């Protein structure tokens, strides 16, 4: 999945698409502090489960590079993002790249009603406002909604109250956190430091997704395993342990002529 990126190199990719500048990241200082683009920062045991933590996690530039790479190389047209933040700006930048290259072809040859749009869902009006203020975007639509503890086929999980009515070809799952979902089922909720995020929204919309759709799950291993155990269609699954990301690709034959065109467009190499 990332062989081309590994061959090119992460720094070379940023030279080609310097989106880090729009994030306000000093690349030399970042590399010096981290010891390299691929070095991970070890979080303390409570950082990701502290209900009082209001500080965004430090940027992981290598993760953002991979997301940008996937959007540009797969010629993604419509993104559904769970959780706003720096990734939102990265998706906006990557969609601009795709729009500049492929807008004419997509408009004239594919059936994409929300072409070159990123729809970002979040439970926090504050973080949406902060992200809007911090990053100017051309292609992002923000969606505030509540999230509740619910069930899928009797299994406890969380569900957003409302999702954007779109047909994404790329989905990024990085939310909700443990403490945003409200309510409980038989006394069980995710609002506990020893619980785990367990979003079930993608299971509910699975049969609306088109063959070729790619899902990226950032960390959230228990959630990724929950999805894998409950998906009903034919998904190819990849887990990259060294950077803790999970990927699901809907590996089915095209649904019809328009889906077939899109899949060929996505897989075709630029000349």
Predicted regions and their residues:
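N-terminal auxiliary segments of SAM/dcSAM-dependent transferases
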Residues: 1-28
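Class I SAM-dependent methyltransferase Rossmann-like catalytic core
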Residues: 28-75, 89-93
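Conserved class I S-adenosyl-L-methionine
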Residues: 75-85
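Conserved SAM-binding loop of SAM-dependent methyltransferases across substrates and taxa
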Residues: 86-111
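A short helix->loop->beta-strand "cap" motif at the edges of active sites that frequently abuts
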Residues: 99, 114-116, 210-213
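S-adenosyl-L-methionine
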Residues: 124-167
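Short SAM/SAH-binding signature in class I
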Residues: 161-175, 181
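C-terminal substrate-binding/active-site "lid" region of AdoMet-derived donor-dependent transferases
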Residues: 177-271
């Amino acid at each position: 999945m990332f062989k081309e990126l590994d061959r090119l190199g992460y720094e070379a990719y940023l030279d080609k698409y310097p989106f880090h500048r729009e994030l306000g990241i000093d690349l030399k200082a970042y590399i010096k502090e981290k010891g390299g683009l691929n070095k991970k920062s070890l979080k303390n045991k409570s950082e990701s489960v502290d209900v009082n933590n209001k500080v965004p996690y430090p940027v992981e530039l290598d993760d953002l590079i991979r997301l940008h790479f996937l959007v540009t190389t797969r010629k993604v047209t419509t993104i559904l993002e769970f959780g706003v933040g720096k990734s939102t700006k990265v998706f906006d930048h990557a969609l601009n790249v795709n729009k500049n290259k492929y807008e004419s072809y997509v408009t004239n040859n594919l059936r994409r009603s929300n072409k070159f749009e990123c729809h970002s869902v979040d439970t926090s009006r504050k973080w949406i406002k902060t992200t809007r203020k911090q990053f100017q975007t051309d292609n992002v639509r923000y969606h505030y909604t509540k999230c509740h503890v619910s069930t899928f086929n009797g299994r406890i999980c969380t569900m957003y109250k409302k999702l954007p009515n779109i047909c994404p070809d790329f989905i990024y799952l990085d939310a909700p956190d443990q403490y945003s979902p409200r309510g409980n089922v038989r006394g069980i909720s995710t609002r506990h430091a020893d619980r785990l995020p367990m979003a079930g929204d993608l299971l509910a919309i699975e049969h609306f997704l088109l063959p070729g759709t790619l899902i990226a799950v950032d960390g959230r291993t228990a959630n990724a395993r929950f999805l894998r155990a409950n998906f009903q269609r034919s998904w190819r699954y990849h887990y990259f342990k060294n950077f803790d990301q999970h990927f699901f690709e809907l590996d089915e034959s095209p649904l019809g002529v328009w889906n077939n065109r899109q899949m060929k467009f996505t897989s075709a190499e630029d000349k």
